[in-house]
Each structure stands twice: as structure tokens, then as C-alpha cells.
């Protein structure tokens, strides 16, 4: 816990905010909030009306019932924000914090965060993070190149980094190995140059493009 000032409020250094007597780096909290905001805004249909469940929704509404947060080695599962019908940053998956900085975020398999929408460009603000597991969610769009700025993440260790089983579209940033983006549903992705919409760029696209050019030239002469 933190020292109390004369007004009875916990003191945090500049750039940090106080939550339940602990200090958290504002930028880390802001990135977590963006994950949540993007999920609420995505409007993804998970069939919750047909198959109602306390854990059906994006983000997973059941996360509001508890928190899985480790702060300097102390495990907390009952922060004051629980059970207010809104998923908040410290309720998102399993988190590890040290000295007010987010060191690990596990929101993948067996956590069931059910996140959706785009991965925020601001993910690079998680400058101290070492573990980033976001597999088995509903993320779409592209993986931002800014993810490669996470200098403390071992991208080649699947226990430290995994984005598999999402709906993220290639090409993926060069820093990400193939096994971290396996089993991706790319059925809704569109590719520049994929003229016939078959999910591949090949000789058929070239033939179609040539024919389109020739047709345009013929029509301009006729």
C-alpha cells in the first residue's frame, strides 16, 4: 500500500493512478481500457440471444465477477470494481504487475476474455510487458506494427507470446513467428491484388487484371 497524504488520499507518482490503494501506470491501464472499448464497440454476434449464458459477450461479462491480478507477488481477486456490470481494466484476464507496471497479460486459452475488434496501435505503450497471450479471441483487422516495439517480449516463446486462433488478417509484422499466428480465421480478410476474391493472389488474378485493362482500352477506342 501507499503512503496517505494529508487529505487521506493515497499518493502516486506522476503518470500513475491509484486504484484500491495501489499505484498503476496510467498508460498501461489505458491500453487495457482500449481493448475493452474496442470489444464493446465491435458489435460482434456471439449468439448470446439464442444461447444465453453469464459468460456470453465481448468482452466476457463474467470477468466482472472477479479479478485475477498479481501485484508485486500478492494475488488479488476482489478489487472494488467487481460486480458493477462493466468489465474494467483490472478485471481483464490474468495480469501480473510489478512496481506499478504491467508485466504480464494472459487473455487467451483457458481465460476466455472473448475480446473482439482491433488490437490497438497503442499496444506499444506496454513497454514493460514480458508476457502477452491473446490467443483464442475474436480480434479482427490487422496486427499493428507497433507490437514489434515491445522489447521485453520473447516473440519466439509461445508461452510468452501468442495471437493464434483469432480473425486477424495477414500480412503479419515481421517480428511475429508463424506459430504465434496459427489457426487464424482469415475468411473475412481481403487482400490487395486478390481480384477474384478467392483468398489468394495468383496467376488467375493477373489474367483477370490484364483482361480488365484490355477491355478498358478497347472501350476507349470503340
Where are these regions (language model features)?
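Short loop/beta submotifs within extracellular cysteine-rich repeat domains
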Residues: 43, 141, 216-220
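Conserved hydrophobic position(s) of the canonical leucine-rich repeat
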Residues: 102, 129, 140, 150-159
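N-terminal capping/linker segments that flank leucine-rich repeat
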Residues: 1-115, 119, 164-199
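Sec-exported extracytoplasmic/periplasmic mature domains
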Residues: 37-40, 152, 211-218
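Solvent-exposed, polar/charged alpha-helical surfaces in well-ordered, non-transmembrane soluble domains
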Residues: 30-33, 37, 121, 145, ...
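Cellulosome-associated attachment modules in secreted, modular CAZymes
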Residues: 187-222
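Conserved hydrophobic beta-strand positions in leucine-rich repeat
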Residues: 105-108, 130-134, 156-163
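The feature encodes a structural signal of leucine-rich repeats
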Residues: 116-124, 140-148, 171-174
Amino acid at each position: 500500500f501507499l503512503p496517505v497524504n494529508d487529505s487521506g488520499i493515497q499518493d502516486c507518482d506522476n503518470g500513475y493512478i491509484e486504484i484500491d490503494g495501489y499505484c498503476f501506470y496510467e498508460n498501461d491501464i489505458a491500453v487495457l481500457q482500449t481493448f475493452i472499448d474496442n470489444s464493446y464497440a465491435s458489435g460482434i454476434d456471439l449468439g448470446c440471444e439464442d444461447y444465453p449464458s453469464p459468460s456470453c459477450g465481448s468482452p466476457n461479462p463474467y470477468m466482472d465477477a472477479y479479478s485475477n491480478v498479481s501485484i508485486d507477488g500478492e494475488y488479488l481477486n476482489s478489487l472494488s470494481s467487481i460486480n458493477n456490470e462493466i468489465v474494467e481494466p483490472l478485471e481483464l484476464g490474468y495480469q501480473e504487475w510489478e512496481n506499478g507496471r504491467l508485466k504480464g497479460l494472459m487473455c487467451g486459452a483457458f481465460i476466455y476474455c472473448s475480446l473482439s475488434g482491433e488490437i490497438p496501435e497503442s499496444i506499444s505503450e506496454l513497454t514493460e510487458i514480458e508476457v502477452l497471450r491473446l490467443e483464442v479471441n475474436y480480434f479482427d483487422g490487422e496486427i499493428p506494427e507497433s507490437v514489434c516495439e515491445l522489447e521485453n517480449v520473447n516473440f519466439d516463446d509461445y508461452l510468452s507470446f501468442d495471437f493464434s486462433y483469432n480473425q486477424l488478417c495477414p500480412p503479419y509484422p515481421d517480428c511475429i513467428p508463424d506459430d504465434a499466428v496459427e489457426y487464424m480465421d482469415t475468411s473475412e480478410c481481403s487482400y490487395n491484388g486478390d481480384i477474384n476474391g478467392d483468398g489468394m493472389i495468383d496467376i488467375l488474378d493477373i489474367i483477370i487484371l490484364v483482361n480488365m485493362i484490355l477491355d478498358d482500352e478497347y472501350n476507349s477506342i470503340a
